[in-house]
Swiss-Prot record:
Bias (Acidic residues): 541-551
UniProt organism field: Drosophila melanogaster (Fruit fly)
Domain of life: Eukaryota
Protein name: C-mannosyltransferase dpy-19 homolog
Disordered: region residues: 514-620
Any one GO molecular function term: mannosyltransferase activity
Lineage, highest ranks first: Eukaryota, Metazoa, Ecdysozoa, Arthropoda, Hexapoda
Length: 872
């Protein structure tokens, strides 16, 4: 990976900004086409938000409607109407960083630029901008790995054509992953940049900036989405495995791993402080593994420094064994420390720690993988379509369109090229006469004399004869075709700038080595002068024995341990660079390029020999070895992990698809056409895009004009209007997690449960509320609801049929949990058709019903026309 200059960086930034604004407009138009939000009133707009999205928008609305930002900020520290009657610190319990940032800038814009800006419009624009950041990073990431601008363009086009497989930002704009994934993607992209710089420079620079940037990205992701910690945990495990198996020097690896683990620790600390002490951030696998990774790497670094001071050579076997033990020990300590810290924190009373988040997701995984009976709430979450597994038919359609079909067409192209070369290699060459060959040699000789200004006396020199022989050999490889010879010569001359860059990098390394050698020689002269003054002149054999020792001392003194960069010995000594597996192929390619260089200029032969000899020992990887570099290995392994996660949870499949858009153009360009990029990007790119054009356009048309999409027809608007008109301002509601947050958002009525079922206390409350769908007795259900101080209970009429249709019916879930009650009828079905003491149906439409709960001391035999709710 070569470092681009300023103009290349600016050009990539300009192209990426173009994709950024294109994608922002793309998702904005899709959302407007699907919802027609500009024509809706405020209640209808807010009714579009369901589950936790409505809850988070309620927090943003409270921040935006205040006189200033800090007034709403203080109100969020003590909220009593989302888990009534308990008081909740929203900043500590929920992932509200996007709402805080958006509300802050909303107040800035409203007070200084546009007083008429609408809160929801401003919020949605912020969401579209975050989606644009994702596409911008996707383009830069693809360009970085493929080292070609068309690699980023290919990833962007694939992302847009199959947008239905990514995070559907236009369907759920307020989903937490829409805010967190841009920061996760930025952290992954910057990590690959740092790894590439280390491999190219063989030293670790900009350590403070790397720690700061990665800590900031990590903290922002952790404060925006609860799944971020799982993603970062997989990243740490991948980095631990791949760095231990790498061939880089131990000191360089240790320096980078220390900074990498420290960035995760600082990111966790920053997130913990900004969330006012969120206890869930204290006991995550990410924090435990990164902590022990930092500590054990410190031990490893001290062990390495001590062995160098003692002059011991590095034992590769012991190093590998230590790396394996260090990896296993880290995982063991990280797994064992979880329960210990939970118990210590709870007993000390420092923070109230529960296992809610992790235990909830572990129960879901156990239900999927082992088909075991888990809790009611875990079974309810597993039946959520967002957490369902990806259908095999849908997965096969994606694989067939993006992998099988393009690569089959690409295989046909490769096969045709192979047969063309095979037929050309087997064609007879005797068609040329000796006269034509001699004429071609004369043309080449004339060109050589004119270009190099060679006199007849210079023709006898060995250097000139060698250069001329190279030109004749190039002519022979072109079948003595003079026109082909000129084209081959011109094309090979164009390939010299990359080699010249490598040559200049090697010159810089040699210059640094010469400076170190000069310092060493001066010290040796001073030492010899001192010894000559005292003991006399030393013998040459003694000086030779002291050379290695003096050289090692000078190297130790030249290396500054406290500086901001760590420079390895392999960068100074080319002979210590590990050999590449494709060294023979590289020597042939360099010899072929040296032929063109020798024909191009008189002085190029000497420069090319220097460049060829230096490049063989350069630390820059060869063509075939670049695909095995650390940043490629990490990106590919991260895609495999994302694929496993996405296949298990449909909601997270966008992780695999987005990373696949980055990897797809890289594999082809690196494995097959590293040297001949023009062939790959002119032929292969066209083949790939043409194979995906038709299904891609179908997907784009389906996004703008969906055939299976219809607006929600559940009559929720009418129920919300009834609640606003016929209930008290402090009436307490409970109901299905899909709509209870919307009820709180639009009516501002207190609620006792919400959609964050991973929280243990909310899971228990939701189980009590959903007991109305079970077969329990009315007295038991009333006692459970009375403990929560519920006044109005919203029920879904579709779940009150007293029939079991599939395993995800609420009645089926309750039957699995309480098999002894299967002989009784469903309570909510009886509630809708009979008079039940302490329960009264006051509202019903085609989809929802509202039940008012009374104290058992109140008589329920009143007539319906005497109830104020029934007189409407």
């Amino acid at each position: 990976m070569r470092e681009p200059n300023l103009y290349v960086i600016l050009s990539h930034a300009l192209i990426g900004c173009g994709f950024f604004f294109l994608y922002v407009q793309h998702v904005r138009v899709i959302f407007e086409t699907r919802t027609n939000i500009q024509q809706l009133n405020q209640l209808e707009r807010e009714a579009l938000l369901r589950r936790e999205d409505a809850l988070y928008y309620a927090f943003y609305k409270q921040l935006a409607e205040g006189p200033d930002f800090w007034h709403g900020y203080e109100q969020l520290k003590n909220v009593t109407d989302i888990e009534y009657p308990h008081s909740v610190n929203v900043l500590q319990r929920f992932y509200v960083l996007p709402e805080l940032v958006t509300a802050y800038f909303f107040h800035v814009v409203r007070s200084g630029f546009n007083p008429m800006v609408q809160p929801m419009q401003f919020y949605l624009e912020f969401v579209w901008l975050m989606g644009g950041v994702t596409l911008l990073v996707l383009y830069l990431y693809g360009t970085l790995l493929s080292e070609n601008i068309f690699g980023g363009i290919y990833g962007v086009i694939s992302y847009l054509m199959f947008h239905s497989f990514v995070a559907k930002i236009y369907e759920r704009p307020l989903a937490r992953e829409n805010f967190a994934f841009p920061f996760i993607f930025l952290q992954m992209f910057y990590l690959c940049i740092c790894i590439g710089r280390i491999i190219h420079r063989q030293r670790h620079t900009s350590r403070m900036f790397m720690i700061f940037a990665m800590s900031l990205f990590t903290a922002c992701a952790l404060l925006s989405w609860q799944f971020s910690t799982f993603i970062f945990t997989t990243q740490i495990l991948i980095m631990m495995t791949s760095w231990n198996a790498s061939a880089l020097p131990t000191a360089l690896v240790n320096a980078f791993v220390l900074d990498y683990s420290l960035s995760h620790l600082l990111g966790h600390a920053l997130a913990f402080v900004m969330s006012h002490g969120n206890s869930q951030l204290l006991l995550t696998w990410q924090l435990s593994i990164s902590l022990f990774l930092f500590l054990i790497t410190m031990v490893r670094q001290l062990r390495h420094v001590r062995s160098r001071r003692l002059g011991h050579a590095q034992d590769l076997l012991n190093g590998d064994l230590f790396s394996l033990k260090f990896l296993m020990l880290t995982l063991l300590l990280a797994s064992s420390v979880q329960t210990t810290l939970i118990e210590l924190f709870n007993r000390a009373g420092v923070v109230s720690v529960t296992e809610g988040d992790q235990q909830h997701f572990f129960d879901i995984c156990a239900h999927w993988a082992l088909q075991v009976n888990v809790g009611f709430v875990a079974h309810l979450s597993a039946c959520n379509p967002q957490y369902a597994r990806v259908a095999w038919s849908e997965l096969w359609q994606l694989v067939k369109t993006m992998i099988v079909k393009p690569y089959c067409m690409y295989g046909v192209v490769m096969l045709a090229m192979f047969f063309r070369r095979w037929r050309k290699s087997g064609a007879p060459v005797s068609a040329l006469t000796e006269e034509q060959r001699e004429r071609a040699r004369k043309y080449v000789l004339e060109d050589f004399i004119e270009e190099h200004f060679v006199s007849m006396s210079d023709m006898s020199s060995k250097e000139t004869e060698k250069q001329l022989y190279k030109c004749f050999r190039l002519l022979k490889s072109c079948d003595y075709d003079y026109e082909r010879y000129k084209r081959a010569q011109a094309s090979l001359r164009k390939e010299q700038p990359p080699a010249r860059d490598d040559f200049m990098q090697d010159i810089k390394r040699l210059r640094a080595q010469i400076n170190r050698n000069s310092v060493k020689q001066r010290k040796e002269r001073a030492q010899e002068t001192k010894e000559a003054a005292t003991d006399g002149a030393s013998t040459p054999t003694e000086e030779e024995d002291k050379d290695p020792e003096a050289e090692s001392e000078s190297k130790k003194k030249n290396q500054e341990p406290g500086s901001g960069e760590t420079e390895t010995e392999s960068a100074a000594d080319p002979t210590e660079t590990p050999p590449s597996r494709s060294a023979d192929n590289e020597e042939e390619e360099e010899e072929h390029s040296a032929t063109a260089a020798g024909c191009g200029s008189n002085s190029s032969g000497h420069r090319q020999r220097k460049r060829s000899s230096s490049r063989r020992s350069s630390v820059v990887p060869t063509a075939n070895a670049q695909i095995l570099n650390m940043h490629y290995v990490y990106s590919f392994l991260q895609m495999l992990v994302f694929t496993l996660i996405g296949l298990a949870v449909r909601k997270l499949f966008f992780l695999s698809f987005t990373q696949g858009c980055v990897i797809a153009p890289t594999v082809c360009s690196k494995l097959w056409y590293h040297r001949q990029r023009n062939i790959f990007w002119s032929v292969s790119l066209a083949v790939f895009l043409l194979s995906m054009f038709d299904p891609g356009m179908v997907n784009i048309r389906e996004e703008y004009f969906p055939t299976r999409y219809s607006k929600s027809g559940d009559d929720l608007d009418s129920m919300l209007e009834w609640i606003k008109l016929n209930t008290e301002r402090d009436a307490v509601f409970a109901g299905p997690v899909d709509i209870i947050g919307t009820v709180h958002l639009t009516t501002k009525r207190p609620i006792v449960n919400h959609a964050h079922l991973e929280m243990r206390q909310i899971a228990e409350r939701t189980e009590h509320v959903y007991s109305v769908y079970s077969r329990q007795q009315s007295s038991d259900i009333y006692n459970q609801c009375a403990q929560l101080k519920i006044q109005y209970l919203i029920i879904s009429l579709d779940e009150c049929t007293n029939e079991v249709r599939d395993d995800c019916d609420l009645l089926a879930i309750w039957d699995d949990k309480q098999p002894a009650y299967q002989k009784y009828p469903q309570f909510c079905h009886e509630l809708l058709h009979k008079n039940v003491p302490s329960f009264l149906k006051v509202f019903a439409n085609d989809h929802y019903g509202i039940i008012k709960m009374f104290s058992q001391s109140v008589q329920i035999n009143l007539k319906h026309n005497k109830m104020p709710e029934m007189s409407i």
